[in-house]
Amino acid sequence: MFLGIDCGTQGTKVLVLDTESGTVLGEGSASHSLISDHNGRREQDVGQWLNALQQATRDALAQSGVSGQQILGIGVSGQQHGLVLLDAQGEVLRPAKLWCDTESAPENQRLLDYLGGAQGSLQRLGLVIAPGYTVSKLLWTKEQYPQLFERIDKVLLPHDYLNYWLTGRCCTEFGDASGTGYFNVRTREWDLPLLAHIDPSGRLGKALPQLVQAHEAVGVLHPEIARLLDLNPAALVSSGGGDNMMGAIGTGNIQPGLITMSLGSSGTVYAYADEARVSEHESVATFCSSSGGWLPLICTMNLTNATTAIRELFALDIAGFNQTVAEAPIGAEGVLILPFLNGERVPALPDATGSIVGLDSTNLTQANLSRAVVEGTTFGLRYGLDLLRDSGIKSEKIRLIGGGSKSAVWRQIVADIMNTPVICTDHAEAAALGAAIQAAWCWSHADGKAEGLQQLCERCVSLDQNSETHPVVHNVAAYQQVYQRYQAQLRKF
């Protein structure tokens, strides 16, 4: 039995996985809240993560009927790019700045200029640093909180911090490290000179966690944490990884030929690669995977956050919102929403704001606005998918995950806009499932069995055949015209 933990933006999810049968026996969840400001600040109190982890673990075990003493391993998935700073006593210095935080966008631009622009960043790191990456948060912290900066002893990502809390050991793996902006994805090494540019004292380089291989365990549970969670004190904690890397494992996307698309708070599209094929498109991030390879990826900053904003504006529940979307025709009678509520990464418009185009006295309806926001967010994913395809990524089918994938009308919109069949996994929360599968993989290595990750995925990742959705020919043609309008609007920014 293995635990998979996913610490996301909106909450923490935990599941209990029986890897012998490939069955999820129980699930639990608990929510987080955001610290937000109009200047782009998006932070969280990491204490919420710990409280949510404890609650969700208790609930998952209770639902499963499994004793915590039967748990052999634990895997942690975490939201990427977040910055958790600890002092020499292991205390958190300030709230964690998150992936969706754009307060440090000016610092990111200064660092990008130092690297020689997009091409210089690609050449040096294998990707282009973007607002939201960890590196600019460090420069921001130094300039905004200089006294606090001098107390930094450990620089961690969200999943690193949870692994540290669970085991007492500071380390990270290549996948999540890829999203820091101070890691070379080709050589899989920290870029220490870049950190020395931010702070010549060398403090930051000394504060970095040790790098470990994806199949390596971090260690066993700390005895105090094992008692707190009522878990087997000999349970191994795996290397873990970022939520996208764990989502790849949780959808079986660990070899070339598959594309995973996540309809979550952010939107992501990614595929596995055997080598670091750095794209010429600066919006494509060639991250490392948490399964031993690489994970070319695009990320949009606005997805269910935008659809939720419209849904709540109209006081609709999810079922009512989906019905309202279905009532409007393709193209929402000319209404087009560019849903850039948090700026945007793909397309690269960090300073953009949202807009509604094409409104008149005849098409201003709940149905049109509801459909337009779903279409607008999906067009952003199409923009990114085109970049991946242009970089040589191919797939005959898309595996959909995330909250939005539960909507039948949204699945049809995705299939039509992408002109590709889509199918959901049985477990939409693929990151938690991937974390549990990776935990089993790490445990098998430590136990001397070395069961292959492919075998585990084949046994534990199942597809929901009832969700399979194919593009409709006349819908594809209609959406191509609407997408061209979307592209024309982008050129005005």
Language model features: what each stretch is:
Residues 1-94, 123, 226-227, 231, ...:
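N-terminal glycine/serine-rich phosphate-binding loop of ATP-dependent small-molecule kinases
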Residues 3-5, 112-125, 133, 139-171, ...:
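Active-site core segments that coordinate phosphate-bearing ligands/cofactors
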Residues 9, 21, 104, 246, ...:
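Short, glycine/acidic-enriched loop or turn micro-motifs at the edges of active sites
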Residues 22, 45, 74, 101, ...:
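Residue-level signal for inorganic ion chemistry
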Residues 23, 30-33, 99, 177, ...:
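A generic structural motif
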Residues 30, 97-104, 177, 265-267, ...:
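Short, acidic/turn-prone active-site loops that include or flank metal/cofactor-
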Residues 62-99, 127-132, 163-184, 210-218:
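Short beta-strand-loop/turn "lid" adjacent to the catalytic site in phosphate-handling enzymes
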Residues 199-213:
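A conserved helix-loop-beta module that forms one wall/lid of the active-site cleft
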